[in-house]
Amino acid sequence: MAVVATLRLSAQGTVTFEDVAVKFTQEEWNLLSEAQRCLYRDVTLENLALMSSLGCWCGVEDEAAPSKQSIYIQRETQVRTPVTGVSPKKAHPCEMCGPILGDILHVADHQGTHHKQKLHRCEAWGNKLYDSGNFHQHQNEHIGEKPYRGSVEEALFVKRCKLHVSGESSVFSESGKDFLPRSGLLQQEASHTGEKSNSKTECVSPFQCGGAHYSHGDSMKHFSTKHILSQHQRLLPREECYVCCECGKSFSKYVSFSNHQRVHSGKRPYECGECEKSFSQKSSLIQHQQFHTGGKPYGCEECGKYFSLEGYLRRHQKVHAGKGPYECGECGKSFSSNVNLKSHQRIHTGERPYKCGECEKSFSRKPSLSYHQRFGRPRWVDHKDRKEFKTSLGNIVKSCLF
């Protein structure tokens, strides 16, 4: 790398960080986009980590190398103007990342992005330094974009990535990274709501730092209360946690998984009573029975009638039980149909909606009106100067000659 070659030329004198850093003016900095500023920050942190690993430090002569908490530099300007309130020999404009970030990235804006977080070091990638946001993005490069999955893989993943808490730092055993918990919170994802599997994963509540924080690993969303987190998990699709070892198909419910296994085992517990054929699933048996019943698979054991829907069969079975499905709330009588029930209820209410257009009589049932119009009222018929009067019995009661 060009930076390494530059640092190796330090035999004649001390190499300063300004030799490898790029300086922007205020006008140039304002023209940069947010993505360009983040890229510039990452490159600066990488150069800073490289100088730290090679032992190249800038500062007062014969002074010991700084600790992790401070870095000593000299400014690039001709006049070595110290930061206000700080010694000219030791500049600490930013306590989190060292003074060079305060000089280049403008101390006020840079400190506002820290939120009291520290740099994280990844040993697997050459001791590179990252802040909290970039470190978790870099961490996902080792373990994939979704480090916590809401299925059986999640339980195996949590067991494989053993997280040990010791003081401030935590060790990620899979990639050998040493880092600090994000915002003082060690997130250990629990299993999804409604998930069932043979191997259970204990749900470890996350540590709290100044307040409750609950996170969902799939969407990386954070919630203030555990109740809101549970509601969010119910909206997500359930993971398929039952996997068939024969064909690799996965199922979210154990019932579906058990029915599928009969395909491989050859079990057929459902038999047809007509032709003695057997089926592995009940739905297949019902579909087969339609060939025997003419599209009506639900049959009554009492009288042998078949129905297309199960609800019709239940209603029919109440007839054999001596009780109709429709019961009157006034007298307790039961009827086989809703029409008969409504006609019966008019007896209690006194309603007579059917009226005769000739004699203005009213009836509670339409068949009573039809009977009245046909036989109940007198009707005169002229036939050879005779009029016949028919009664309700249809017989000639009286014959009059005029």
UniProtKB/Swiss-Prot annotation:
<dbReference type="InterPro" id="IPR001909">
    <property type="entry name" value="KRAB"/>
</dbReference>
<feature type="cross-link" description="Glycyl lysine isopeptide (Lys-Gly) (interchain with G-Cter in SUMO2)">
    <location>
        <position position="366"/>
    </location>
</feature>
<dbReference type="GO" id="GO:0008270">
    <property type="term" value="F:zinc ion binding"/>
</dbReference>
<feature type="cross-link" description="Glycyl lysine isopeptide (Lys-Gly) (interchain with G-Cter in SUMO2)">
    <location>
        <position position="177"/>
    </location>
</feature>
<feature type="zinc finger region" description="C2H2-type 3">
    <location>
        <begin position="242"/>
        <end position="264"/>
    </location>
</feature>
<keyword id="KW-1017">Isopeptide bond</keyword>
<keyword id="KW-0677">Repeat</keyword>
<feature type="zinc finger region" description="C2H2-type 6">
    <location>
        <begin position="326"/>
        <end position="348"/>
    </location>
</feature>
<feature type="zinc finger region" description="C2H2-type 7">
    <location>
        <begin position="354"/>
        <end position="383"/>
    </location>
</feature>
<keyword id="KW-0539">Nucleus</keyword>
<dbReference type="InterPro" id="IPR013087">
    <property type="entry name" value="Znf_C2H2_type"/>
</dbReference>
<comment type="function">
    <text>May be involved in transcriptional regulation.</text>
</comment>
<comment type="similarity">
    <text>Belongs to the krueppel C2H2-type zinc-finger protein family.</text>
</comment>
<keyword id="KW-0863">Zinc-finger</keyword>
<feature type="cross-link" description="Glycyl lysine isopeptide (Lys-Gly) (interchain with G-Cter in SUMO2)">
    <location>
        <position position="253"/>
    </location>
</feature>
<feature type="zinc finger region" description="C2H2-type 4">
    <location>
        <begin position="270"/>
        <end position="292"/>
    </location>
</feature>
<dbReference type="InterPro" id="IPR036236">
    <property type="entry name" value="Znf_C2H2_sf"/>
</dbReference>
<protein>
    <recommendedName>
        <fullName>Zinc finger protein 587B</fullName>
    </recommendedName>
</protein>
<feature type="zinc finger region" description="C2H2-type 1">
    <location>
        <begin position="92"/>
        <end position="114"/>
    </location>
</feature>
<dbReference type="GO" id="GO:0006357">
    <property type="term" value="P:regulation of transcription by RNA polymerase II"/>
</dbReference>
<dbReference type="Pfam" id="PF00096">
    <property type="entry name" value="zf-C2H2"/>
</dbReference>
<feature type="domain" description="KRAB">
    <location>
        <begin position="15"/>
        <end position="91"/>
    </location>
</feature>
<dbReference type="GO" id="GO:0000977">
    <property type="term" value="F:RNA polymerase II transcription regulatory region sequence-specific DNA binding"/>
</dbReference>
<keyword id="KW-0832">Ubl conjugation</keyword>
<feature type="cross-link" description="Glycyl lysine isopeptide (Lys-Gly) (interchain with G-Cter in SUMO2)">
    <location>
        <position position="200"/>
    </location>
</feature>
<dbReference type="Pfam" id="PF01352">
    <property type="entry name" value="KRAB"/>
</dbReference>
<dbReference type="GO" id="GO:0000981">
    <property type="term" value="F:DNA-binding transcription factor activity, RNA polymerase II-specific"/>
</dbReference>
<feature type="zinc finger region" description="C2H2-type 5">
    <location>
        <begin position="298"/>
        <end position="320"/>
    </location>
</feature>
<keyword id="KW-0479">Metal-binding</keyword>
<dbReference type="GO" id="GO:0005634">
    <property type="term" value="C:nucleus"/>
</dbReference>
<dbReference type="InterPro" id="IPR036051">
    <property type="entry name" value="KRAB_dom_sf"/>
</dbReference>
<keyword id="KW-0862">Zinc</keyword>
<feature type="zinc finger region" description="C2H2-type 2; degenerate">
    <location>
        <begin position="120"/>
        <end position="142"/>
    </location>
</feature>
